[in-house]
């Protein structure tokens, strides 16, 4: 099976800071891949390389190759806007637009020239994000009136509405309470039927619950990547074992 994403000898710098050093890994389709590691290890930097978000930051340099379905996303003739449409991003803090719930979901599709049934697209996206039943009678109310957990699921629906292949999530539940976090985790598990998901999390219990593969990063390097059950119970590297057992973090 061809990987959905293939990362080959990836190096990334913020100015002189060599933040990612020789990362090579595959992300399989319709799986949840978790990126774990201590703060500053490069998890979020790697995630943002996967849809060219980091190149919006001045003074950065990238070397290496990232392939999506076999195509180089950093090739000179590749439009970064199209990359970000195919590989969507959900951020750590919910960031709904100051618009109605409906407009939040429809906006991306509208600016991308969607010509299908917008009402159906909004409903489908909200259902996929497990939010439809909670908001179907208030679609034209402000998204800012929703709870934090609902706002984050709305942001997931907004990402899905542009019909990506891959969804990147940067600690999507870190600002939420346990009940809202559980709902997000259930949503992620359902979404992998239709999407490939890469998630950054500091919560190792969360990684073990929802991911199929886990990659452990430390000081900008990929230390180990394996099926999640194996990485948490039978890690191959001493440093991985020390991290997952809480001896350092």
UniProtKB/Swiss-Prot annotation:
<dbReference type="GO" id="GO:0015415">
    <property type="term" value="F:ATPase-coupled phosphate ion transmembrane transporter activity"/>
</dbReference>
<keyword id="KW-0592">Phosphate transport</keyword>
<keyword id="KW-0472">Membrane</keyword>
<feature type="domain" description="ABC transporter">
    <location>
        <begin position="5"/>
        <end position="244"/>
    </location>
</feature>
<keyword id="KW-0813">Transport</keyword>
<keyword id="KW-0997">Cell inner membrane</keyword>
<comment type="function">
    <text>Part of the ABC transporter complex PstSACB involved in phosphate import. Responsible for energy coupling to the transport system.</text>
</comment>
<dbReference type="InterPro" id="IPR017871">
    <property type="entry name" value="ABC_transporter-like_CS"/>
</dbReference>
<keyword id="KW-1278">Translocase</keyword>
<dbReference type="GO" id="GO:0016887">
    <property type="term" value="F:ATP hydrolysis activity"/>
</dbReference>
<keyword id="KW-0547">Nucleotide-binding</keyword>
<dbReference type="GO" id="GO:0005886">
    <property type="term" value="C:plasma membrane"/>
</dbReference>
<protein>
    <recommendedName>
        <fullName>Phosphate import ATP-binding protein PstB</fullName>
        <ecNumber>7.3.2.1</ecNumber>
    </recommendedName>
</protein>
<feature type="binding site">
    <location>
        <begin position="37"/>
        <end position="44"/>
    </location>
    <ligand>
        <name>ATP</name>
    </ligand>
</feature>
<dbReference type="GO" id="GO:0005524">
    <property type="term" value="F:ATP binding"/>
</dbReference>
<keyword id="KW-0067">ATP-binding</keyword>
<dbReference type="InterPro" id="IPR027417">
    <property type="entry name" value="P-loop_NTPase"/>
</dbReference>
<comment type="subunit">
    <text>The complex is composed of two ATP-binding proteins (PstB), two transmembrane proteins (PstC and PstA) and a solute-binding protein (PstS).</text>
</comment>
<dbReference type="Pfam" id="PF00005">
    <property type="entry name" value="ABC_tran"/>
</dbReference>
<comment type="similarity">
    <text>Belongs to the ABC transporter superfamily. Phosphate importer (TC 3.A.1.7) family.</text>
</comment>
<dbReference type="InterPro" id="IPR005670">
    <property type="entry name" value="PstB-like"/>
</dbReference>
<keyword id="KW-1003">Cell membrane</keyword>
<dbReference type="InterPro" id="IPR003439">
    <property type="entry name" value="ABC_transporter-like_ATP-bd"/>
</dbReference>
<dbReference type="InterPro" id="IPR003593">
    <property type="entry name" value="AAA+_ATPase"/>
</dbReference>
<dbReference type="GO" id="GO:0035435">
    <property type="term" value="P:phosphate ion transmembrane transport"/>
</dbReference>
């Amino acid at each position: 099976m061809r990987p959905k994403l293939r990362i080959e000898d990836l190096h990334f710098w913020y100015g002189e800071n060599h933040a990612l050093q020789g990362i090579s890994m595959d992300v399989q389709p319709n799986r949840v891949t978790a990126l774990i590691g201590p703060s500053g290890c490069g998890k979020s930097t790697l995630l943002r390389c996967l849809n060219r978000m980091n190149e919006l930051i001045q003074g950065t340099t990238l070397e290496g190759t990232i392939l999506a379905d076999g195509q180089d996303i950093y090739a000179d003739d590749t439009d970064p806007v199209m990359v970000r449409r195919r590989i969507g991003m959900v951020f750590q803090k919910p960031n709904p637009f100051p618009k109605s719930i409906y407009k939040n979901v429809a906006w991306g599709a509208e600016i991308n020239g969607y010509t299908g049934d917008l009402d159906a697209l909004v409903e489908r996206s909200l259902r996929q994000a497990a939010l439809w039943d909670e908001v179907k009678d208030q679609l034209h109310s402000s998204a800012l009136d929703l709870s934090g957990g609902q706002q984050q699921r709305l942001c997931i629906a907004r990402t899905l509405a542009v019909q990506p292949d891959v969804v990147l999530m940067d600690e999507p539940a870190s600002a939420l309470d346990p009940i809202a976090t559980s709902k997000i985790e259930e949503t992620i598990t359902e979404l992998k039927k239709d999407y490939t998901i890469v998630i950054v999390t500091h919560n190792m219990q969360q990684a073990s619950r929802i991911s199929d593969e886990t990659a452990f990063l430390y000081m900008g390097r990929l230390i180990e990547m394996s099926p999640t059950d194996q990485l948490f119970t039978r890690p191959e590297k001493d440093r991985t074992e020390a991290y997952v057992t809480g001896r350092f973090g």
